[in-house]
Amino acid sequence: PPVPQQVVVWIVRFVVGISCYVSRSNWKRGIMAAVFAMLITLVTSQLGMTIRFGILHMFAFAILLWWLIDTVCRHKKLRTAVVSLVLGIAIIAIDYGFSSAYENGMRFTTDKTWFFVADWLNAGVSSSDYYPIFPSVGYVLIGSFFGYLLYNKRRSLFPRLGRYSWHAPFDFWGRIALWV
Protein backbone atom coordinates (compact mmCIF):
# COMPACT_ATOMS: atom_id res chain seq x y z
CA PRO A 1 0.00 0.00 0.00
CA PRO A 2 1.10 3.59 -0.61
CA VAL A 3 2.90 5.37 2.25
CA PRO A 4 0.11 7.96 2.88
CA GLN A 5 -2.41 5.13 3.26
CA GLN A 6 -0.12 3.33 5.71
CA VAL A 7 0.29 6.52 7.77
CA VAL A 8 -3.47 7.13 7.91
CA VAL A 9 -4.17 3.52 8.90
CA TRP A 10 -1.46 3.67 11.59
CA ILE A 11 -2.99 6.87 13.01
CA VAL A 12 -6.49 5.36 12.99
CA ARG A 13 -5.29 2.22 14.82
CA PHE A 14 -3.51 4.42 17.36
CA VAL A 15 -6.65 6.56 17.90
CA VAL A 16 -8.77 3.42 18.34
CA GLY A 17 -6.36 2.47 21.13
CA ILE A 18 -6.76 5.88 22.76
CA SER A 19 -10.54 5.44 22.45
CA CYS A 20 -10.29 2.11 24.26
CA TYR A 21 -8.76 3.88 27.23
CA VAL A 22 -11.31 6.71 27.22
CA SER A 23 -14.43 4.60 26.58
CA ARG A 24 -16.50 3.22 29.40
CA SER A 25 -18.20 0.61 27.23
CA ASN A 26 -15.52 -1.34 25.35
CA TRP A 27 -17.45 -4.61 25.60
CA LYS A 28 -20.46 -3.00 23.91
CA ARG A 29 -18.31 -1.21 21.29
CA GLY A 30 -16.36 -4.39 20.54
CA ILE A 31 -19.48 -6.52 20.13
CA MET A 32 -21.11 -3.86 17.96
CA ALA A 33 -18.00 -3.65 15.75
CA ALA A 34 -17.90 -7.48 15.52
CA VAL A 35 -21.54 -7.64 14.43
CA PHE A 36 -20.98 -4.99 11.76
CA ALA A 37 -17.80 -6.77 10.64
CA MET A 38 -19.71 -10.03 10.22
CA LEU A 39 -22.41 -8.23 8.25
CA ILE A 40 -19.75 -6.73 5.98
CA THR A 41 -18.29 -10.20 5.40
CA LEU A 42 -21.74 -11.57 4.58
CA VAL A 43 -22.62 -8.76 2.16
CA THR A 44 -19.22 -8.63 0.44
CA SER A 45 -19.18 -12.41 -0.01
CA GLN A 46 -22.50 -12.14 -1.84
CA LEU A 47 -20.99 -9.45 -4.08
CA GLY A 48 -17.95 -11.60 -4.92
CA MET A 49 -15.38 -9.35 -3.21
CA THR A 50 -15.24 -10.95 0.20
CA ILE A 51 -13.77 -9.09 3.14
CA ARG A 52 -12.67 -11.88 5.47
CA PHE A 53 -10.72 -10.00 8.14
CA GLY A 54 -10.80 -6.31 7.37
CA ILE A 55 -10.11 -3.28 9.45
CA LEU A 56 -13.44 -3.46 11.27
CA HIS A 57 -12.84 -7.13 12.17
CA MET A 58 -9.42 -6.16 13.51
CA PHE A 59 -10.87 -3.24 15.49
CA ALA A 60 -13.51 -5.51 17.02
CA PHE A 61 -10.84 -8.03 18.03
CA ALA A 62 -8.55 -5.30 19.42
CA ILE A 63 -11.32 -3.59 21.40
CA LEU A 64 -12.48 -6.87 22.91
CA LEU A 65 -8.87 -7.84 23.70
CA TRP A 66 -8.37 -4.49 25.44
CA TRP A 67 -11.61 -5.04 27.38
CA LEU A 68 -10.29 -8.46 28.46
CA ILE A 69 -6.93 -6.98 29.53
CA ASP A 70 -8.71 -4.24 31.49
CA THR A 71 -10.99 -6.81 33.14
CA VAL A 72 -8.09 -9.12 34.08
CA CYS A 73 -6.20 -6.08 35.44
CA ARG A 74 -9.29 -5.29 37.56
CA HIS A 75 -9.77 -1.91 35.89
CA LYS A 76 -6.52 -0.59 37.37
CA LYS A 77 -5.67 1.92 34.67
CA LEU A 78 -1.88 2.01 35.12
CA ARG A 79 -1.68 -1.79 35.20
CA THR A 80 -3.90 -2.06 32.12
CA ALA A 81 -1.81 0.55 30.30
CA VAL A 82 1.49 -1.20 31.07
CA VAL A 83 0.16 -4.65 30.10
CA SER A 84 -1.24 -3.15 26.88
CA LEU A 85 2.10 -1.52 26.06
CA VAL A 86 4.11 -4.69 26.71
CA LEU A 87 1.67 -6.90 24.79
CA GLY A 88 1.48 -4.38 21.92
CA ILE A 89 5.27 -4.27 21.59
CA ALA A 90 5.43 -8.08 21.81
CA ILE A 91 2.82 -8.47 19.04
CA ILE A 92 4.73 -6.10 16.75
CA ALA A 93 8.09 -7.75 17.56
CA ILE A 94 6.72 -11.25 16.95
CA ASP A 95 5.26 -10.11 13.64
CA TYR A 96 8.58 -8.55 12.65
CA GLY A 97 10.48 -11.72 13.54
CA PHE A 98 8.15 -14.08 11.73
CA SER A 99 7.81 -11.76 8.72
CA SER A 100 11.60 -11.69 8.39
CA ALA A 101 11.73 -15.49 8.57
CA TYR A 102 8.93 -15.74 5.99
CA GLU A 103 10.77 -13.40 3.61
CA ASN A 104 13.84 -15.63 3.95
CA GLY A 105 11.93 -18.63 2.65
CA MET A 106 10.52 -20.15 5.82
CA ARG A 107 6.88 -21.26 5.49
CA PHE A 108 4.74 -21.82 8.56
CA THR A 109 1.55 -23.36 7.22
CA THR A 110 -0.56 -23.97 4.17
CA ASP A 111 -3.71 -24.15 6.27
CA LYS A 112 -5.94 -21.24 5.26
CA THR A 113 -7.80 -21.34 8.59
CA TRP A 114 -5.32 -19.05 10.31
CA PHE A 115 -5.01 -16.31 7.66
CA PHE A 116 -6.50 -13.64 9.96
CA VAL A 117 -3.64 -13.92 12.45
CA ALA A 118 -0.81 -12.58 10.28
CA ASP A 119 0.46 -12.11 6.73
CA TRP A 120 2.97 -14.90 7.26
CA LEU A 121 0.10 -17.33 7.91
CA ASN A 122 -2.27 -16.26 5.16
CA ALA A 123 -1.35 -19.17 2.87
CA GLY A 124 -2.41 -17.25 -0.23
CA VAL A 125 -5.82 -16.14 1.05
CA SER A 126 -7.02 -12.98 -0.63
CA SER A 127 -9.37 -10.43 0.85
CA SER A 128 -10.62 -7.06 -0.38
CA ASP A 129 -9.66 -5.49 2.96
CA TYR A 130 -7.05 -7.23 5.11
CA TYR A 131 -5.67 -6.15 8.49
CA PRO A 132 -4.34 -9.19 10.37
CA ILE A 133 -4.03 -9.35 14.15
CA PHE A 134 -0.22 -9.27 13.91
CA PRO A 135 0.90 -6.40 13.90
CA SER A 136 -2.32 -4.33 13.70
CA VAL A 137 -3.61 -5.09 17.19
CA GLY A 138 -0.20 -4.19 18.61
CA TYR A 139 -0.60 -0.62 17.40
CA VAL A 140 -4.07 -0.39 18.97
CA LEU A 141 -2.73 -1.62 22.31
CA ILE A 142 0.15 0.86 22.20
CA GLY A 143 -2.40 3.57 21.42
CA SER A 144 -4.30 2.63 24.57
CA PHE A 145 -1.12 3.13 26.59
CA PHE A 146 -0.84 6.63 25.15
CA GLY A 147 -4.52 7.11 25.99
CA TYR A 148 -3.50 6.56 29.60
CA LEU A 149 -0.63 9.06 29.29
CA LEU A 150 -2.71 11.73 27.55
CA TYR A 151 -6.12 11.33 29.19
CA ASN A 152 -5.38 9.99 32.66
CA LYS A 153 -7.30 12.91 34.18
CA ARG A 154 -10.13 12.42 31.67
CA ARG A 155 -9.92 16.01 30.44
CA SER A 156 -9.95 16.90 26.76
CA LEU A 157 -6.73 18.12 25.23
CA PHE A 158 -8.79 20.15 22.76
CA PRO A 159 -10.48 23.36 23.87
CA ARG A 160 -14.20 23.97 23.44
CA LEU A 161 -14.63 27.05 21.30
CA GLY A 162 -18.35 27.66 21.52
CA ARG A 163 -21.41 26.04 19.99
CA TYR A 164 -20.07 26.06 16.41
CA SER A 165 -16.52 25.20 17.26
CA TRP A 166 -13.82 24.00 14.91
CA HIS A 167 -14.33 20.38 15.93
CA ALA A 168 -18.07 20.17 15.11
CA PRO A 169 -17.48 18.36 11.77
CA PHE A 170 -15.25 15.84 13.54
CA ASP A 171 -17.87 15.34 16.26
CA PHE A 172 -20.50 14.61 13.61
CA TRP A 173 -18.37 12.12 11.68
CA GLY A 174 -17.24 10.51 14.91
CA ARG A 175 -20.86 9.85 15.89
CA ILE A 176 -21.73 8.25 12.55
CA ALA A 177 -18.37 6.64 11.67
CA LEU A 178 -19.54 3.07 12.11
CA TRP A 179 -22.50 3.65 9.80
CA VAL A 180 -20.30 5.20 7.10
Sequence positions of predicted segments:
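Alpha-helical transmembrane segments and their immediate juxtamembrane cytosolic regions
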Residues: 1-180
